[in-house]
Amino acid sequence: TTGTQNVAVGANALDANTTGSENTAVGYQTLGANTTGDHCVAVGWQSLLRNTTGNSNVAVGSHSLDHNTTGGGNVGVGTHTLSGNTTGTGNTAVGQQPMLYNTTGNYNSAYGWTALQDNTEGNYNTALGGGALANNTTADNNTAVGYNSLTANTTGAYNVGVGVYSLDANTTGQQNTAVGYDSLGANTEGIYNTAMGTNALRSNTTANSNTAFGWSALNANTTGTSNTAVGR
């Protein structure tokens, strides 16, 4: 077979089709080791089950991008979403365990429950809710926005934070910022800091360049260095 438009629906779905083309597939082993990629989609149970060789990907439920090889546009959406995707590229991911152990990083995003869950090997990151940057390893450019925000991110890089527990005990520091609620929430291994509202530099440890602006501003900062502060 030499591919072209494809669809397929159940059982072993695109059972080792060669050579790819437009793809879709829907149930059980959906893109069942399709070779050689092209525009993909896949929808249910083992969705992109070890699709080879990548291209535009999507996948939607159950094991979603289940060990996809070799990368491509990625997206994901539900259950295990980017489940152990190998080897990275475009990424996104949306619900429950989004970037569950994605390997090997690249452009990232992620949105819900355990967001960037233990993503391995970092790259451009973002993440928005749930456990946000849930123990991301190994860092790169970070952001993170709600709930546990940078939840114990490892290992640092450019950080930001924004809401709820924001830089929540981030490890190991680097360029920091953080904006609301628990802000620099006992950040660990400091570096350039900033922080802005609610508990601002809340007992930041271990310091470095500081700043802080509102509400509890330099809230009992520990341990010193360059400081500033403006509001309460």
Regions found by a protein language model. Name each.
Residues 1-232:
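Glycine- and small/polar-enriched repetitive beta-structure motifs of secreted/surface proteins
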